[in-house]
């Protein structure tokens, strides 16, 4: 699998949201991904009952750790009308075949297609999680907080994951003009 990047430009994020708005399901998936730090496998496993209170408690599939977090306004604005006629036991991102969520591959295609249409490359489902980490870091400059939110084992891993390390290296190369 190719390396994917966070989406650092908020205008590009907005452009992707506008593109995805034609499908409330796809827009909600992208919005939750950007605002929760969840991996795509955890996003796809969410049910209506897990989110309708506005607070999520779930066990992450990869780490088996319990994750708790409130759903912010960006998520709730898309979520509330989307789940209005859905039952608690329904998957949020149900496939058209019914009874199951869409596949990780389908989610990948949705995000990849939207990002391409908006002029971005090297963006995929994992970019949503990376974008969350990047934006938390940009807002707080607290890499320990980012590390905790992403369940990483070290600050260095988090910096590399969100693309900060490479950005700093690139800037040094650009600034040194001998």
Place the predicted regions along the sequence by residue:
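Conserved catalytic core of the tyrosine transesterase superfamily
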Residues: 1-178
């Amino acid at each position: 699998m190719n390396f994917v990047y966070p989406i650092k430009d908020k205008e590009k994020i907005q452009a992707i949201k506008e593109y995805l708005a034609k499908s409330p399901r796809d827009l909600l998936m992208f919005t939750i991904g950007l605002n929760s730090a969840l991996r795509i496998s955890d996003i796809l496993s969410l049910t209506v009952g897990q989110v309708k209170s506005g607070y999520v408690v779930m066990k992450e599939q990869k780490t088996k750790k319990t994750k708790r977090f409130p759903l912010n306004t960006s998520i709730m604005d898309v979520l509330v009308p989307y789940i209005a006629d859905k039952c608690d036991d329904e998957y949020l991102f149900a496939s058209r075949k019914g009874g199951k969520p869409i596949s990780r591959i389908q989610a990948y295609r949705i995000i990849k297609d939207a990002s391409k249409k908006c002029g971005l490359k090297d963006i995929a489902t994992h970019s949503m999680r990376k974008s969350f980490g990047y934006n938390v870091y940009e807002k707080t400059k607290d890499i320990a907080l980012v590390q905790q939110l992403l369940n990483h084992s070290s600050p260095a891993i988090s910096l590399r994951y969100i693309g900060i390390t490479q950005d700093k290296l690139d800037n040094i190369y650009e600034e040194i003009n001998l």
